[in-house]
């Protein structure tokens, strides 16, 4: 992976350090069954997924595969790459005896998350919605399987700290480190807003995060 690109942020020089942190995160997660699959082009056409039990997401979905990031951009849209990547994840889930796929999306379109409308057209169903804009979708292979759910820690979207801005992040996204440590810091300083930054360093911390 040292010589391969990972799609996101590869042309954004200011995110170079964040990009390398994501690569390190990926290498560690491969040992947990994580999969990163992309088109063999210098393009943003890829899917990431792994066992939901090992996902850095506050979701309870035993025996599902969790799609973490799924993106097809630019001229590669409309060419069937998204369906092919999704089908590869479905086939992996079947081969592993999984009950299905699960993912978190914006209830309304968030530019940094999967396209809920497209996923629903591919057979995903909305399982749960949070009041502050996130939805849990599932594509069941086993119709009798229990529904996945958000962990109770995220039900309100609130954290213990009530002053200013509190941000939680991991190295799962190659944009996170730069924009949290630079863009967000700059904005809050300019506006005189208190800022607390919490980097989630373990899977357990991420699974029990308040958002």
What are these regions (language model features)?
Residues 131-155:
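C-terminal "cap" of GNAT-fold acetyltransferases
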Residues 58-74:
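Conserved acetyl-CoA binding element of GNAT-fold acetyltransferases
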Residues 104, 120-137:
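Conserved catalytic-core motifs of GNAT/GCN5-like acyltransferases
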Residues 24-45, 66, 111, 210:
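A short helix-loop-beta-strand connector motif used in the catalytic cores of GNAT acetyltransferases and
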Residues 91-111:
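Conserved GNAT acetyl-CoA-binding A-motif
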Residues 195-211:
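Thioredoxin-like thiol-disulfide oxidoreductase module
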Residues 155-189:
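Local sequence-structure signature of Cys/Sec-based thiol-disulfide redox active-site neighborhoods
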Residues 72, 78-93:
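Conserved acetyl-CoA-binding loop-helix of GNAT-fold acetyltransferases
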